[in-house]
């Protein structure tokens, strides 16, 4: 199952192709992605982050083995072949344990890597860029690379132990700012310089040599860089190819390497395509998919209010708001301003902190109630036209069933389609 190295080989041969990575644990987002990949007969890359999934459960409550089981069960139920499914681990390193001394944090990171590799994750992003409690800020390239090489050695040994061979594919480096969208309002963004990218690569090459890992260098398929794309709560910094031209040209000197771009959410279809052409050929997308999920659910909640007596409504939006106010830990440090500004951000921000709340039992019950209310009888076409106009066109042409679930899935797939088109190549 060498989908990624084959993709890189084709890209380096001039095909201008790429692959997108679905970074979400939401069942409806994953179903939308699996069904879309199945319909288009493409492999599907699904990634878990070190915050979502770790050996202790992460914020989803899932270990890597749990996450793999969950995704594979869903794929099986949708008749998606498991050999077309690639699982990746994102920002694997001491990220979750920055408040601990480095020795302790890295011991946890060793176990994190073991748990991901043993569970069958094949794309491993080694990211040791964050300073721990007793570290200098920022870390030098050499320290970052030494720690990454240590984790690579653990990964290789674990893979051989569990699967008889080491067939992992690695991504190294990190982007600025932190994953998941910027905390503050953005105006300008520094593109990674070619010198910084080269320094990261050379530091890692040297550190891998010291660990006796020369042979795995061709399996280091991508370097994470900042090509100048980001989003905050209400704005998107669009890709400007001219600003990334020197960086784009620099990677052409490396035979088996492309770039991986994070925070590509909300870029225009044209920008996504240009990113892939410019060798930022692994596109990460997460918040934009749960943002589309939220859009569809808010639209269905508005339709519900038109059709169902108030006392029988799910009250999804109010339940969501109440839970977010009761448990503000996932948005409080991100959303600023007066009460109204924070209220708007909770519901509508591009950074989509609401995605952390969908698993809550009260919210999940309200979601199920909403779906039941709208599944009992056909949704009137004029209301679909009003609240989900893109889906209305497909319903009218006969290509989409106007059930609540299908409307949600299709709205998410509209975003996936942009990524698929960007990655198709010539």
Swiss-Prot record:
GO biological processes: carbohydrate metabolic process; D-tagatose 6-phosphate catabolic process; phosphoenolpyruvate-dependent sugar phosphotransferase system
GO cellular component terms attached to this protein's record: plasma membrane
Matching InterPro entries: Aldolase_TIM, GatZ/KbaZ-like, GatZ_KbaZ_carbometab, TagBP_ald_KbaZ
Cross-referenced SUPFAM superfamilies: Aldolase
A family per Pfam: GatZ_KbaZ-like
Pathway in which the depicted protein is active: Carbohydrate metabolism; D-tagatose 6-phosphate degradation; D-glyceraldehyde 3-phosphate and glycerone phosphate from D-tagatose 6-phosphate: step 2/2
Family according to the record: Belongs to the GatZ/KbaZ family. KbaZ subfamily.
UniProt function note: Component of the tagatose-1,6-bisphosphate aldolase KbaYZ that is required for full activity and stability of the Y subunit. Could have a chaperone-like function for the proper and stable folding of KbaY. When expressed alone, KbaZ does not show any aldolase activity.
Assembly information from the UniProt record: Forms a complex with KbaY.
PANTHER family: D-TAGATOSE-1,6-BISPHOSPHATE ALDOLASE SUBUNIT KBAZ, N-ACETYLGALACTOSAMINE PERMEASE II COMPONENT-RELATED
NCBIfam families named among the record's database cross-references: agaZ_gatZ, PRK15458.1
Protein name as it appears in the record: D-tagatose-1,6-bisphosphate aldolase subunit KbaZ
Organism encoding this protein: Escherichia coli O6:K15:H31 (strain 536 / UPEC)
């Amino acid at each position: 199952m060498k989908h990624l190295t084959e993709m890189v080989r084709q890209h380096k041969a001039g095909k201008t192709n790429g692959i997108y990575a679905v970074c979400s644990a939401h069942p409806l987002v994953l179903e939308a992605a699996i069904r879309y990949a199945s319909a288009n007969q493409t492999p599907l890359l699904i990634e878990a982050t070190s915050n979502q999934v770790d050996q202790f459960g992460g914020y989803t409550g899932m270990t890597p083995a749990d996450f793999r089981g969950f995704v594979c069960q869903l794929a099986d139920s949708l008749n998606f072949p498991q050999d077309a499914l690639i699982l990746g681990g994102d920002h694997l390193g001491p990220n979750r344990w920055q408040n601990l001394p480095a020795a302790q944090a890295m011991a946890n990171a060793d176990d994190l890597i073991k748990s991901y590799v043993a569970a069958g994750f094949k794309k491993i992003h080694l990211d040791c860029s964050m300073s721990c409690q007793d570290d200098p800020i920022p870390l030098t390239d050499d320290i970052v690379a030494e720690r990454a090489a240590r984790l690579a050695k653990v990964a290789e040994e674990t893979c051989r132990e569990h699967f008889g061979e080491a067939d992992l594919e690695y991504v190294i480096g990190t982007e600025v700012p932190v994953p998941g969208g910027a905390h503050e309002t953005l105006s300008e963004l520094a593109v990674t310089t070619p010198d910084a990218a080269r320094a990261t690569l050379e530091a890692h090459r040297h550190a891998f040599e010291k660990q006796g890992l020369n042979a795995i260098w061709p399996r280091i398929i991508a370097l994470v860089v900042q090509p100048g794309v980001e989003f905050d709560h209400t704005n998107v910094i669009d890709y400007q190819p001219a600003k990334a031209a020197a960086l784009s040209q620099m990677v052409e000197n490396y035979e088996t390497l492309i770039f991986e771009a994070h925070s590509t959410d909300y870029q225009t279809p044209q920008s996504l395509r240009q990113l892939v052409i410019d060798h930022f050929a692994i596109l990460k997308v997460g918040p934009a998919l749960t943002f589309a999920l939220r859009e569809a659910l808010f639209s269905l909640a508005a339709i519900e209010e038109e059709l169902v007596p108030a006392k029988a409504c799910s009250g999804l939006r109010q339940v969501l708001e109440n839970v977010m106010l009761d448990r503000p830990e996932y948005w409080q440090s991100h959303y600023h301003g007066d009460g109204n500004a924070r209220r708007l951000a909770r519901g509508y921000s591009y950074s989509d902190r609401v995605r952390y709340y969908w698993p809550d039992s009260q919210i999940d019950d309200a979601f199920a109630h909403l779906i039941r209310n709208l599944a009992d009888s056909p949704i009137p076409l004029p209301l679909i036209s009003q609240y989900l106009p893109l889906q209305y066109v497909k319903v009218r042409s006969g290509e989409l069933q106007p059930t609540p679930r299908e409307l949600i899935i299709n709205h998410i797939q509209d975003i996936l389609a942009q990524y698929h088109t960007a990655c198709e190549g010539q």
